[in-house]
């Protein structure tokens, strides 16, 4: 998924996708044994990058999710060693 696809997607889809990416991160850090194959994007860096792109797009269109914050994405990045 690239920035063009993100910009063309509905807010509903972006919420769903961001939620999916969050759940993948939680599983990766927990029962997933830190296996990158469990991540939608296939690796840690791309997963976090995609989360940022979606989050920023939602903020741009005035639809920032109440259940996700910049700090949470940063925390995932630190825990997944991509900072």
Annotate each predicted stretch with a short phrase:
Residues 35-79:
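Short, charge-rich amphipathic interface segments used for partner binding and complex assembly
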Residues 2-39:
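N-terminal acidic leader/helix
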């Amino acid at each position: 998924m690239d920035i063009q696809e993100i910009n063309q997607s509905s807010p509903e889809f972006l919420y769903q996708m961001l939620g999916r990416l969050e759940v993948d991160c939680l599983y990766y850090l927990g029962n997933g044994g830190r296996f990158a194959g469990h991540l939608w994007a296939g690796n840690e860096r791309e997963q976090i990058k995609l989360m940022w792109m979606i989050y920023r797009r939602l903020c741009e269109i005035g639809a920032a999710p109440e259940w996700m914050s910049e700090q949470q994405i940063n925390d995932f990045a630190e825990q997944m060693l991509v900072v």
